[in-house]
From Swiss-Prot:
Belongs to the sulfotransferase 3 family. It is a single-pass type II membrane protein. GO terms for cellular component: Golgi membrane. Sulfotransferase that catalyzes the transfer of sulfate to the position 2 of uronyl residues in glycosaminoglycan chains. Has mainly activity toward iduronyl residues in dermatan sulfate, and weaker activity toward glucuronyl residues of chondroitin sulfate. Has no activity toward desulfated N-resulfated heparin. It comes from the Eukaryota. Its EC number is 2.8.2.-. Residues 386-400 have a biased composition (Acidic residues). It comes from Mus musculus. The chain crosses the membrane at residues 50-70. This is Uronyl 2-sulfotransferase.
Length: 407
């Protein structure tokens, strides 16, 4: 019986019913009508390329819109590229030398009792030395502003002669919200309990600048209030030693929104976000020399030579005059209560401290502190009040700085 020949898919019989001969493709019989379809692949590649380019364009436009709508200042973006996103353990050494752009608008919205008078003294010397415009304010006890006050202050700052460095005790201002160019922010904070104790005794007894300094600063304070024992103030829950007065550092970074003055997660997270997006550097007072070193590294047009000035014996002598006098340490029970009431302040402080140390490691600087920070144990926190805070009574009279500088 004859076997049926296999039918070829294109019609007719298949000349190789058992497969094509070994050793290559079969010769073309008759006219070859089958071709390899290259064009569809080419068309697919062009479509894919066009899709990628369109996506890139949308991303670029979105980035531009973000920048115009209040994104981080260009200098901070360049700095992040300079430092990279890897951790120190992923690096093999300090980053290669590179020239960073020069920001011409810097704001130091200094936190009270965090070394600001020392830094202002240094800035006065540096502004004369390097020729930048140091802009200060005669208002020292108004940190929260109305919308109109924000607009007026931003207008005054933005029209200052550049390059400028503006400094004042004021909560974070969003320049972009009012159509201004967002400046680069810098600041310094310290351990919250240490800051509170320094301010508590400074308001009552001043510092080494003069015996009557505190009388000028708080003339209306009654004697019983001036000599109020710190433990009684804390344990008896006096307004000065409880919330919202203790919720002090975070609003400087959270901003002017009313919720920024309410102790809680919302203000804390917003403060962290602003630190990441708008602050070039937030240092800690406990490591002031490293803070000055980083400022000199990032802002040489403002801070070049600041460390040598700070270490100068004459400056040390003047700096010692700003040390608060008559400070006493509260009892352990009182300190633990302060920890409980300042839980959000401590969470923010430790976050800033860790970011500061990470930045130092990326630049190859060894931390001067040994071991990890000891975090306070809050146990069961007491309820945090959210009433309107009392205005900051710290009036930073800077006339003495001018008198010292003229010597």
């Amino acid at each position: 019986m004859k076997k049926k020949q296999q039918q070829h898919p294109g019609g007719g019989t298949d000349p190789w019913p058992h497969g094509a001969p070994v050793g290559g493709a079969p010769p073309c019989l008759g006219s070859c009508k089958r071709r390899i379809p290259l064009l569809p692949f080419l068309r697919f590649s062009l479509r894919d390329y066009g899709f990628c380019m369109a996506t890139l364009l949308v991303f670029c436009l979105g980035s531009l819109f973000y920048q115009l709508s209040g994104g981080p200042p260009r200098f901070l973006l360049d700095l992040r590229q300079y430092l990279g996103n890897s951790t120190y353990l992923d690096d093999h050494g300090p980053p290669p030398s590179k020239v960073l752009p020069f920001p011409s608008q810097v704001v130091y919205n200094r936190v009270g009792k965090c070394g600001s008078r020392t830094v202002v003294l240094l800035l006065r010397i540096l502004s004369e030395k390097h020729g930048f415009n140091l802009v200060t304010s005669d208002i020292h006890n108004k940190t929260r502003l109305t919308k109109n006050e924000q607009m007026e202050l931003i207008k005054n700052i933005s029209t200052a002669e550049q390059p400028y460095l503006f400094t004042r005790h004021v909560h974070f201002l969003n320049f972009s919200r009012f159509g201004g160019d967002q400046p680069v922010y810098i600041n310094i904070i310290r351990d919250p309990v240490s800051r509170f104790l320094s301010n508590y005794f400074f308001r009552r007894f001043g510092d080494w600048r003069g015996e009557q300094n505190h009388m000028i600063r708080t003339p209306s304070m009654r004697q019983e209030e001036r000599y109020l024992d710190i433990n009684e103030c804390i344990l008896e829950n006096y307004p000065e030693c409880s919330n919202p007065r203790l919720f002090y550092i975070i609003p400087y970074f959270c901003g002017q929104h009313p919720r920024c003055r309410e102790p809680g997660e919302w203000a804390l997270e917003r403060a962290k976000l602003n630190v990441n997006e708008n602050f070039l550097l937030v240092g800690i007072l406990e490591e002031l020399e490293d803070v000055l070193l980083l400022l000199e590294r990032f802002l040489p047009h403002y801070f070049k030579g600041v460390l040598s000035i700070y270490k100068d014996p004459e400056h040390r002598k003047l700096g010692n005059m700003t040390v608060t006098v008559r400070k006493t340490v509260p009892s352990p029970e009182a300190v633990q209560i302060l920890y409980q009431r300042m839980r959000y302040e401590y969470e923010f402080y430790h976050y800033v401290r860790e970011q500061f140390h990470l930045l130092k490691r990326k630049l190859g600087l060894k931390s001067r502190v040994s071991g990890p920070p000891v975090r306070p144990q809050f146990f069961i926190p007491t309820p945090l009040e959210t009433e309107e805070p009392i205005d900051d009574e710290e009036q930073d009279d800077e006339k003495w700085l001018e008198d010292i500088y003229k010597r």
